[in-house]
């Protein structure tokens, strides 16, 4: 009888345990479902938040040059020379549309374009200015020194006309240039792609800065000259009367004509310097294409290469030579004007250096101008001759071909390099090689010795003469 109460108590305890466990399980399931629901809601909230942020980020306007590709150079001449031509367009030269485009196919020329109209308007203005200068010179005693305004303005007018004709050919020239570049061995690094464009930009920047400095010094010297030879009480009017004397030689003073003369002088000075820079820039581009081919030949120097390799490189070399001929035909007149112009002005400046300088400002301007002129002429000669130097450098690598790899293609390639005279020319009268530097120097010395025999010490600030004569 005592066993039954004990058994009953045990059954009660067991029933409580079973009941309590099932309750806990139900509670656990409820809690688990609540946790899952809360987790899903938090995930949905987070997902919606991310999507909203993504939509907001995409809705913001993107900058056109924010992409990485916009800052990388493709190594093409078209891209490297784009900004240079853009500056030239501001000064009424090379009126070509699309010079800053990514591909040469963006280039176009039209007579109805505003760039072309501006260029034609400035050509007409330069023609009128040249006519006034010619009239003044012919109505005064003519000397080697007095024809400076005619040489200066005549060369500027000629370069403007040639540049307008070159602008018509430029899209086709750049398309052919792009075709040649595409077939060449590709650049290995971004640095090699960037090098040509960087060199062109630095040459343009340095040339324009020195040209601007020369013009500022010229203005300071002209102000001193105008104050020394004052015709009127107004210093500004006196300055324009002295610096634009070819205009007021045939008409009375006018503020409009004075501003037109100053505008003409500033633009003409830029164009006079730009024609040298343009020859240098084209030379840098052509020389870099030969260098691109030579770098590939240097990488395989002394190795046994298949005949197909030499055949491909020979065709690439021939294409660059054809490109040089096309560019030379297009710019040879500019090259001729550049060298003849520099030769004349160096002779004139050296002859004037024998005279006594009337002021410190004039002396600073004169010697800065002379050094800049000689340096610019030397730079044009050396950069232009680099085309010939790079074309001949190919022969050095061909002579290192092993005996086992010697084949008719290598022999043919070598004969082409030896027999061809690859260089820019001045209308086919002379080739721009390193020998030309010595020839020009010898010519200047010869002319200078002859001119010294007839030289007379003159007053550089003769108020009866033009400031620029």
From Swiss-Prot:
Residues 1-117, 168-199, 287-330, 375-435 are cytoplasmic. Residues 139-146, 221-265, 352-353, 457-469 are extracellular. One of its GO terms (cellular component) is membrane. It holds the Pfam family Trehalose_recp. GO terms for molecular function: ionotropic sweet taste receptor activity; ligand-gated monoatomic ion channel activity; sweet taste receptor activity; taste receptor activity. Belongs to the insect chemoreceptor superfamily. Gustatory receptor (GR) family. Gr5a subfamily. This is Gustatory receptor for sugar taste 64f. The lineage of its organism: Eukaryota, Metazoa, Ecdysozoa, Arthropoda, Hexapoda. The gene is Gr64f.
């Amino acid at each position: 009888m005592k066993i039954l109460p004990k058994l009953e108590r045990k059954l009660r305890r067991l029933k409580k345990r079973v009941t309590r466990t099932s309750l806990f399980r139900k509670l656990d399931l409820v809690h688990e479902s609540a946790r899952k629901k809360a987790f899903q809601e938090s995930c949905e909230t987070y997902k919606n938040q991310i999507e909203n942020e993504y939509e907001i980020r995409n809705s913001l306007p993107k900058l056109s040059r924010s992409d990485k590709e916009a800052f990388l150079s493709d190594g093409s001449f078209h891209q490297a020379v784009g900004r240079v031509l853009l500056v030239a367009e501001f000064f009424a030269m090379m009126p070509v549309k699309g010079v800053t485009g990514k591909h040469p196919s963006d280039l176009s020329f039209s007579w109805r374009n505003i760039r072309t109209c501006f260029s034609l308007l400035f050509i007409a203005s330069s023609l009128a200015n040249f006519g006034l200068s010619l009239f003044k010179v012919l109505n005064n005693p003519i000397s080697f020194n007095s024809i400076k305004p005619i040489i200066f303005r005549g060369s500027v007018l000629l370069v403007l006309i040639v540049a307008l004709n070159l602008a018509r050919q430029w899209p086709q020239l750049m398309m052919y240039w792009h075709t040649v570049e595409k077939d060449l061995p590709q650049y290995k690094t971004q640095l090699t792609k960037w090098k040509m464009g960087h060199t062109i930009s630095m040459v343009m920047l340095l040339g324009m800065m020195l040209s601007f400095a020369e013009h500022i010094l010229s203005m300071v010297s002209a102000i001193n000259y105008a104050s020394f030879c004052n015709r009127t009480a107004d210093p500004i009017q006196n300055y324009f009367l002295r610096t634009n004397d070819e205009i007021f030689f045939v008409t009375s003073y006018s503020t409009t004509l004075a501003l037109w003369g100053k505008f003409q002088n500033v633009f003409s000075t830029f164009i006079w310097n730009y024609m040298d820079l343009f020859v240098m820039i084209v030379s840098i581009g052509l020389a870099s294409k030969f260098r691109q081919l030579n770098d590939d030949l240097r990488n395989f120097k002394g190795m046994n290469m298949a005949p197909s390799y030499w055949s491909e490189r020979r065709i690439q070399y021939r294409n660059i030579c054809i490109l040089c001929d096309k560019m030379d035909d297009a710019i040879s007149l500019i090259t001729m004007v550049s060298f003849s112009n520099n030769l004349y002005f160096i002779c004139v400046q050296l002859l004037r250096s024998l005279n006594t300088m009337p002021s410190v400002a004039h002396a600073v301007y004169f010697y800065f101008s002379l050094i800049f002129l000689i340096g610019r002429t030397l730079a044009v000669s050396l950069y232009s001759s680099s085309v010939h130097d790079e074309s001949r450098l190919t022969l050095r690598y061909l002579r290192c071909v092993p005996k086992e790899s010697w084949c008719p293609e290598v022999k043919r390639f070598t004969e082409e390099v030896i027999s061809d005279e690859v260089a820019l020319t001045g209308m086919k009268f002379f080739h721009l090689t390193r020998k030309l530097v010595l020839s020009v120097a010898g010519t200047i010395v010869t002319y200078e010795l002859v001119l010294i025999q007839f030289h007379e010490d003159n007053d550089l600030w003769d108020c009866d003469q033009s400031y620029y004569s």
